[in-house]
């Protein structure tokens, strides 16, 4: 990481930097292209190889450079921004910055997010000279960083020649949007200010032609699916996380309305479909599903999964009671019907839209759900001053998001996954977490990026262990004037790891978290931090955060017992532990 990692001007009041060599420069072209695809904030850490490029990014009127405290958080911020805006970008320096941001790029790749990672590279004259440069591993071959990025990006552009720079940049950015994956752009440090005829002042706007379904394949898939679903007695509909990639959320809602099926969402699809749908029955997550949801899904004689990802986490250690012969699996460009045929070149949005027009309405599964459903009981009342329980915390968070203008809820890897899944999201409230990659600390940077992209406040639930990984970019939230509400759950360690496999390594040093945030605040910007230990203090803190301090970044440290976990985490942890502990197959 660069020693000057906290550098860069305030993103709200960045000094105007005039490019040194006219308008038709590489740096100016890259900046305009970013704005054109919807990026207005680039999350950056300055280093000597990217400084001139940052000058040109800052000079673009529609672009802000948000200086982050480290490259990992810059990458996480671009991840969060992409979730809200559809595309995100970060800028770092060569190798020391690139390898630091790489973990975040891996997370964005796994979550199918278009993220443009820009790296300031060596001077173009140094390529092929056998020179050894700083910020390298001491070899004259500068390709080590590129080779690290290749498995984690869908396109890589090494721009060290102006003649093909325009084409490489345009192709990289368009590929990120089209494939919904990260891309890597390395720009030699001596090129951003150099004019070239290919960098016109107003580049031709991007036009990405939509992927079209093969009509014969589409109709064959529809016929097979309708025959499969219409003969079922109690079919159900389940949303998966690839609805985002396919941009098929609206088509899924149309199908839910037309079919009458009971509707569930996989955990990583929470927030992608409205939970206000009339036949929504909750989260399907195997043994840790919303009450009565798994019973309805797993007992169905047919289920349509739209954009699922089945891994060891989403299947609770491969323990879901699903059968392939009962499933229609719709992926962004493919449909598979039971044990029968698979239909390629079928776009999910087209398929779901057409299916909604032809499907036969069947409310049997939802009718069964209504018969067996028993409302959850009331939480026991807390005694005055009684130590705060985590379930009481989330009772109050549920009330808060229902009554305040909250744009999204973000859940950090850990018990917050399970507690936040139980929140019933109001109309228009998003939900984000990183289930496939599961990198602890992700939510701090992602919160920074997401909040920078939206107008409404964002709520984040973060465990103490995760917060210690990436805490310093609370500083950047303050510099950006953000108003998020952070609930820091202090239970003394890595609780999710404890429930998978306990050991002394899961205990962490306790911090004075409120004191830390106040030190970061240092009287600059709007920030309010408090610690709560009982329900009365929590109620007062939420009232203040949504009232007098509604224009501030609010940090509420919630002190909880180390063994206060959700029952879902206990169940999930034991099943994932069993999956991890399988003995080697006989050789």
Swiss-Prot record:
TM segment ranges: none
Cofactor(s) this protein requires: a metal cation; thiamine diphosphate
Amino acids binding substrate: 48, 135, 497
Keyword GTP-binding: no
Cellular component terms per the entry's GO annotation: cytosol
EC numbers for this chain: 4.1.1.1
Residue span of region Thiamine pyrophosphate binding: 415-496
Annotated catalysed reactions: a 2-oxocarboxylate + H(+) = an aldehyde + CO2
Family, as annotated: Belongs to the TPP enzyme family.
Subunit structure and binding partners: Homotetramer.
Protein name stated in the entry: Pyruvate decarboxylase 3
Organism this protein belongs to: Oryza sativa subsp. indica
Lineage: Eukaryota, Viridiplantae, Streptophyta, Embryophyta, Tracheophyta
């Amino acid at each position: 990481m660069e020693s000057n990692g906290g550098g860069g001007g305030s993103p709200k009041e960045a000094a105007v930097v005039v490019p040194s060599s006219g308008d038709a420069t590489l740096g100016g072209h890259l900046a305009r292209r970013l704005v054109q695809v919807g990026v207005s904030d680039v999350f950056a850490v300055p280093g000597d190889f990217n400084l001139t490029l940052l000058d040109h990014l800052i000079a673009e009127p529609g672009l802000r450079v948000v200086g982050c405290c480290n490259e990992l958080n810059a990458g996480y911020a671009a991840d969060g921004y992409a979730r809200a805006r559809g595309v995100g970008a970060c800028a770092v320096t060569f190798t020391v910055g690139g390898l630091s941001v790489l973990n975040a790029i891996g997370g964005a790749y796994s979550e199918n997010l278009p993220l443009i990672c820009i790296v300031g590279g060596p001077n173009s004259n140094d390529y092929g000279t056998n020179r050894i440069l700083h910020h390298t591993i001491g070899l004259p071959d500068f390709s080590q960083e590129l080779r690290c990025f290749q498995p984690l990006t869908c396109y890589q552009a090494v721009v060290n020649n102006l003649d093909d720079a325009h084409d490489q940049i345009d192709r990289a950015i368009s590929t990120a949007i089209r494939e919904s994956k990260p891309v890597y752009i390395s720009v030699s440090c001596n090129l951003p200010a150099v004019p070239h005829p290919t960098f016109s002042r107003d580049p031709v706007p991007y036009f990405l032609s939509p992927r079209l379904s093969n009509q014969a394949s589409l109709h064959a898939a529809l016929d097979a699916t309708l025959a499969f679903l219409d003969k079922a007695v109690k079919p159900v509909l389940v949303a998966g996380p690839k609805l985002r990639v396919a941009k098929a959320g609206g088509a899924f809602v149309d199908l839910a309305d037309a079919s009458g099926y009971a509707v569930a969402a996989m955990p990583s699809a929470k927030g992608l479909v409205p939970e206000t749908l009339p036949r929504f029955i909750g989260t399907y997550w195997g043994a840790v599903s919303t009450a009565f949801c798994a019973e309805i899904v797993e007992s169905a004689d047919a289920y349509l999964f739209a954009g699922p990802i089945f891994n060891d986490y989403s299947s609770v250690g491969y323990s879901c009671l699903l059968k392939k012969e009962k499933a229609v699996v719709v992926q962004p460009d493919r449909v598979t019907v039971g044990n029968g045929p698979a239909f390629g070149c079928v776009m999910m949005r087209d398929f779901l839209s057409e299916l909604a027009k032809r499907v036969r309405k069947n409310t049997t599964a939802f009718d069964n759900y209504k018969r067996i459903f028993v409302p959850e009981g009331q939480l026991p009342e807390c005694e005055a001053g009684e130590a705060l329980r985590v379930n009481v915390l989330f009772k109050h968070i549920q009330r808060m998001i229902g009554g305040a203008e909250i744009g999204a809820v973000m859940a950090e890897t850990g018990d917050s996954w399970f507690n936040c899944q139980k929140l019933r999201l109001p109309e228009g409230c998003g939900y984000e977490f990183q289930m496939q990659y599961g990198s602890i600390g992700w939510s701090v940077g992602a919160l920074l990026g997401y909040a920078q992209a939206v107008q409404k406040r964002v709520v984040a639930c973060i465990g103490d262990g995760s917060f210690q990984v990436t805490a310093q970019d609370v500083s950047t939230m303050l510099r950006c004037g953000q108003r998020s509400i952070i609930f820091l759950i202090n239970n003394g360690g890595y609780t999710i790891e404890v429930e998978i496999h306990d050991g002394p390594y899961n205990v962490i040093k306790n911090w004075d978290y409120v004191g830390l945030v106040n030190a970061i605040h240092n009287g600059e910007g709007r920030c309010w931090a408090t610690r709560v230990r009982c329900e009365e203090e929590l109620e007062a803190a939420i009232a203040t955060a949504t009232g007098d301090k509604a224009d501030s970044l609010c940090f509420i440290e919630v002190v909880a017992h180390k063994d206060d976990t959700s029952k879902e985490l206990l169940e999930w942890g034991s099943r994932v532990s069993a999956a991890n502990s399988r003995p080697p197959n006989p050789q």
